[in-house]
Amino acid sequence: MCTRYYADIDKELKPFIDEAQNASFAQQMMISLSRPLTMYGEIRPTDIAAVIAPARNGQRAVFPMQWGFSISGMKTPIVNARIESAAEKPTFRDSWYRRRCVIPASWYYEWQHYKTPGGRTRTGEKYAIQPKDSDITWIAGLYRFEEMNGFKYPVFAVLTREPSEAVSGIHDRMPVILPQSAVDDWIALNGDPDEIVKSAITDLVLEKA
């Protein structure tokens, strides 16, 4: 799972955050959802974040999006989508083919999970995880539009996959992280998501947070 990531406004992510905060519907989104437009620091589910997606002309743009797909009858939104089943799941199928996005982050957080002698899963130490030799973690995601009181706004979910060797010691899932060179292809309407994810990054570094 991926339920936390960090966006450092003092470094390479500032242009993305600035663009999202200045989007034409950003203020209305903040008011309608009663959420701040901070978009930096530790980002949690239901926060508004800066997300890369295609504009109407097909060009890359950055928009404010809320983290999590709302599901009728569920109190909490779905924040992750399993890459193995996203193309078939009714919740994500349309987004998989038509609405893909990228979440620029400094790193993501994960908590170590381990089994007790009695077989119970416990949560251990918190780790910051990012690609080796990269200042930006390009997290693959899906998005769609939801509506509240007549206001339509975008929401996103993070795609997850089986962990790389480096991550497998602390968790059984990790986000799909793209190389920078694949960002435009991933969000393109004519992109082939099954082919693009083959370039996903698995060489990651971890440190205790």
Regions found by a protein language model. Name each.
Residues M1-A209:
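Short linear sequence motif anchored by a di-proline
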